[in-house]
Amino acid sequence: MNELINICTKNTRLSKAQIEYLDKISLLFPFIADISYSQVTMYVRDRVKSLIIVAQAKPHTSFFQYKPNSIGSMAKGSEEPLIWRTFRFAKHIQGKREWAVGLLLDMYTFPLYDSNGEMVAVICFETNY
């Protein structure tokens, strides 16, 4: 079982079909990261409404300072306000994030819906391009 499926099965209320849908989308992340010159990250809500990173890809087309793999890590809404607002209001949001001291990145968040119109994840693009 791959990591995304394992994390979602253990920590979320997503259905098997929703998890498989997210898994298929995550397979495109390396390509999406390269053509968007962005780090691409997928967040889902866990059972207690914290956020979990379930997929991530860094671009090969632009330089990003080293940041450890965050897959499986959890965050509270206060730690990821743009992600949380995207979950709450189901709208695309643009903002900034401090990647390291003094280094701001542009951040774009998008809600991701399943075939029934239910929001299942947020995809975030972070770029310094």
Language-model features, listed with the residues they occupy:
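Juxtadomain coupling helices with adjacent low-complexity linkers
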Residues: 1-2, 7-18, 122-129
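Structured interaction and signal-relay segments at domain junctions
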Residues: 29-92
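Sensory/regulatory domains in signal-transduction proteins
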Residues: 76-129
